[in-house]
């Protein structure tokens, strides 16, 4: 239950939705897609590493005063009570078995769903900006991986 919740609400679903929404907000306001990608996606690893090494409070003690002020005053506005209520609903779906039933029904009805779901969820401008940034950094430009359901997708990146 905890693993499913973490994947859906924070580590995969929540993180991807937060990054995508922040990226869209900046691009719609006229900022270059590459700059938006760098700020909202690429730098995520740096913050995650600080939290992993030092905890949330330790991360807060290592960021700039401006970033800290924004964290403490704007973060709760982004992730407020409404988000907590939705997270509670997601956990209830997992605990009741509703998520498992939904997932199994989807796979039975649409055997190709994982790839189709990836295709529908692809954010063209975000992925294009990511390919440019990764290319400039000497990394593989494509974000494509082995595909859902493989052992390789469950391994943490270096």
Where are these regions (language model features)?
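N-terminal hydrophobic or amphipathic segments with adjacent small-residue motifs
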Residues: 7-8, 16, 49, 91
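NAD(P)-dependent Rossmann-like dehydrogenase/reductase catalytic/cofactor-binding core
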Residues: 34-158
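Alpha-helical protein-protein interaction elements
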Residues: 2-4, 29, 48, 61
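Amphipathic alpha-helical segments within well-ordered protein domains
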Residues: 20-28, 91
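Short intrinsically disordered, low-complexity coil segments enriched in acidic
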Residues: 1-3, 20, 122, 148
